[in-house]
Design a protein with these regions (language model features):
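ABC family nucleotide-binding domain
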Residues: 2-207
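Conserved switch/coupling elements of ABC/ABC-like ATPase nucleotide-binding domains
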Residues: 208-214
C-alpha cells in the first residue's frame, strides 16, 4: 500500500501541490489525469524519490520513506518499484539486452528474462543491438521493458506511450496491465490519453484541491 500524507511542494514560490493526501491500495492500476501544469509529474517524482516534498510524507507499506537511510531507500526503490518517465534514459554503451537486464544484475535468469521482455514489447531478436540503432519509439519500448523486467510491486509511469503510434501504444498498455495483474502488483500512470486511462482499474483527476475520482 502507498500512502501520501499532506504532501506540499513549491517551485520558485509557486505551490504545485498543497497538503495532498491519498491512499493507493495494493494491486490497483490507477490512472491520473489533469490539466497541464497541475503537478502530475511532480507527484510521481515525489513518490519515486527523485524529488523531496517541502512537507508531508510518502509512506510505503507503513514505512515513511523519509525514515529510511539513503541505502535502504535506494534498495526499496530498486527492488520494489519500476519507473517509466517521459525523460527515459538508456545507456548507449550497453546492448539492448544489457540495458533491460540492469535491474536483474544479481539474478542468474537476467538474460532470459531480458530477452522475454524485449520480445513482449516487439523487439524480439534485437537484444544484441545498441541504442544508436533504434528509433525514439523503439527506445521508449526498451525503457518499458526495463521497468517491468524485475516484476516490481509498484510501477510508476509518466505518459508511458507518449512517443508511440496508437497501435503500438495499445499493445504496450495491454502488456503493462497483463504484467501488473499477473504479479499482483500496482501501478500509478500519469496520462492525458482517455484511451490509456480506460486500461486502468481507477481513474483519478488531479486538481489544485487534490485527487478525486474522474
Amino acid at each position: 500500500m502507498l500512502e501520501l500524507a499532506n504532501l506540499t511542494k513549491t517551485y520558485g514560490g509557486r505551490t504545485v501541490l498543497s497538503n495532498l493526501s491519498h491512499v493507493f491500495e495494493a494491486g490497483r492500476f490507477v490512472a491520473i489525469m489533469g490539466e497541464s501544469g497541475v503537478g502530475k509529474s511532480t507527484l510521481l517524482n515525489l513518490i519515486a524519490g527523485l524529488d523531496a516534498p517541502d512537507s508531508g510524507q510518502v509512506i510505503v507499506d507503513g514505512t515513511p520513506m523519509a525514515a529510511l537511510d539513503d541505502d535502504a531507500a535506494t534498495r526499496l526503490r530498486r527492488t520494489r518499484m519500476g519507473f517509466i518517465f517521459q525523460a527515459f534514459h538508456v545507456l548507449p554503451h550497453l546492448s539492448l539486452q544489457q540495458n533491460v537486464a540492469l535491474p536483474l544484475l544479481l539474478n542468474r535468469s537476467a538474460t532470459a528474462r531480458a530477452e522475454a521482455m524485449l520480445a513482449a514489447v516487439g523487439l524480439a531478436g534485437r537484444g544484441a543491438d545498441f541504442p544508436r540503432q533504434l528509433s525514439g519509439g523503439e527506445l521508449q519500448r526498451v525503457a518499458i521493458a526495463r521497468a517491468l523486467v524485475h516484476q516490481p510491486a509498484l510501477l510508476l509511469a509518466d505518459e508511458p506511450t507518449g512517443n508511440l503510434d496508437p497501435e503500438t501504444a495499445g499493445g504496450i498498455l495491454r502488456l503493462l496491465r497483463a504484467e501488473i495483474k499477473a504479479n499482483g502488483a500496482g501501478a500509478i500512470m500519469v496520462t492525458h490519453s482517455h484511451a490509456a486511462a480506460e486500461m486502468a482499474d481507477e481513474v483519478l483527476l488531479l486538481t489544485r484541491e487534490g485527487l478525486r475520482p474522474a
